[in-house]
Structure formats: C-alpha cells, structure tokens
C-alpha cells in the first residue's frame, strides 16, 4: 500500500507538470515507453533498481537509455529524480497512476462492461451513452464476455462495481433462503 501512495504522489506531480506544459498525453506516452523498456529488459531493470551498483554508474546508464529513447527533458529529469531517490522500481505503478490522473484531468472514464453474451454495437453504444450521462464524462468503454454471469451485466468504473448479473441475484436469493 505504501508503494501505491508513493506512485500516486509521483504520478500526480508529473501530471501537474504535464498540464503546465500542455503535454499530459505526451508525458504519458513517454512514461509508458520507459516502463515497457524496463519490462522487456530484466537486466536493465535489475541494475537500475539494485543497491549493489553505484549511483553514478546507474545515472550514466539511465542517461544513455534516455538519450536513445529521445524523451522530453521533463520526463527525463523526472526519471532521474526517481533513480536518485531509489524509486525507479515504482515506474510501472507510477505509469498506471499517471494514466488514471490524466484521465481525470481530461474528463475521461474507462469502465469495463462484462456481459454473459457478446453485445452488439447498438447495445455497446447505448451503455456508453448511459454511462456518459450518469458520469458526466467522456466514456471509453471496454467490453468483455463472461458466460458465468448467466445473464445481465457487471460494470466496473475505477473501484466501483455495479453488478446487475443474474448470477449475483441468484446468489442473493440463495443467501436469503439459507438464512430462512
């Protein structure tokens, strides 16, 4: 939980810098590029995270990597601060929190809609417009199928879940009957 708090703090700071520079989207892409590089190169990630290597050596490696990625000065400086403070290992969590804060700033909500059967385009658009009306934000809906729901839909927006599935309703009825 502490790592999430740390990640949110750094992500919020970078989003604020991005907003000041009008580069929120670009910073998100650049942070994602660096995170993908670390995810794809375990040796690089372990060197940058390891306390066994001198900070000067890690700074030089990071500078070389940043030069090859051609990131903006702000994101490069941000990543150097993370390295200096021993927080470079939090980059994936920071990138995730950054995306959440950037969406908030842009008025975007990204719900996940799970249904028992595939929805057609009209149904997806109907759900999108209903969610946009309810949230007052632009909706970028992700739809998936889970046949275990039996029927109905489950909508997850951030940490809130709206469960209108038949499976949940049957479970509730079963609980009521068992309690008698």
UniProtKB/Swiss-Prot annotation:
Gene3D superfamilies named among the record's database cross-references: N-terminal domain of the delta subunit of the F1F0-ATP synthase (1.10.520.20)
MF terms in GO: proton-transporting ATP synthase activity, rotational mechanism
UniProt KW keywords: ATP synthesis, Cell inner membrane, Cell membrane, CF(1), Hydrogen ion transport, Ion transport, Membrane, Transport
Record membrane topology: Peripheral membrane protein
SUPFAM superfamilies per record: N-terminal domain of the delta subunit of the F1F0-ATP synthase (SSF47928)
Subcellular location: Cell inner membrane
Pfam family, one: OSCP
Transmembrane segments: none
Source superkingdom: Bacteria
GO process terms (BP): proton motive force-driven ATP synthesis
Keyword Ion transport: yes
Family: Belongs to the ATPase delta chain family.
Function: F(1)F(0) ATP synthase produces ATP from ADP in the presence of a proton or sodium gradient. F-type ATPases consist of two structural domains, F(1) containing the extramembraneous catalytic core and F(0) containing the membrane proton channel, linked together by a central stalk and a peripheral stalk. During catalysis, ATP synthesis in the catalytic domain of F(1) is coupled via a rotary mechanism of the central stalk subunits to proton translocation.
Subunit composition and interactions: F-type ATPases have 2 components, F(1) - the catalytic core - and F(0) - the membrane proton channel. F(1) has five subunits: alpha(3), beta(3), gamma(1), delta(1), epsilon(1). F(0) has three main subunits: a(1), b(2) and c(10-14). The alpha and beta chains form an alternating ring which encloses part of the gamma chain. F(1) is attached to F(0) by a central stalk formed by the gamma and epsilon chains, while a peripheral stalk is formed by the delta and b chains.
PANTHER family per record: ATP SYNTHASE DELTA CHAIN
Protein name, as recorded: ATP synthase subunit delta
Organism: Geobacter sulfurreducens (strain ATCC 51573 / DSM 12127 / PCA)
């Amino acid at each position: 939980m502490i790592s999430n708090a740390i990640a949110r703090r750094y992500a919020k700071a970078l989003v604020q810098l991005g907003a000041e520079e009008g580069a929120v989207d670009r910073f998100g892409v650049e942070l994602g590029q660096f995170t993908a590089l670390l995810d794809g190169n375990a040796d690089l990630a372990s060197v940058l995270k390891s306390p066994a290597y001198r900070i000067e050596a890690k700074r030089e490696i990071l500078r070389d990597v940043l030069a090859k990625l051609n990131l903006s000065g702000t994101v490069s400086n941000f990543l150097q601060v993370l390295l200096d403070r021993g927080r470079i290992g939090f980059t994936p969590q920071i990138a995730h929190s950054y995306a959440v804060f950037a969406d908030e700033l842009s008025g975007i909500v990204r719900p996940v809609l799970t249904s028992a059967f595939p929805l057609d385009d009209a149904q997806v658009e109907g759900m999108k417009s209903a969610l946009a009306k309810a949230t007052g934000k632009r909706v970028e809906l992700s739809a998936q199928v889970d046949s275990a729901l039996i029927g109905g839909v489950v909508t997850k927006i951030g940490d809130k879940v709206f469960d209108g599935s038949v499976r949940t309703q049957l479970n509730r009825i079963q609980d009521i009957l068992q309690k008698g």
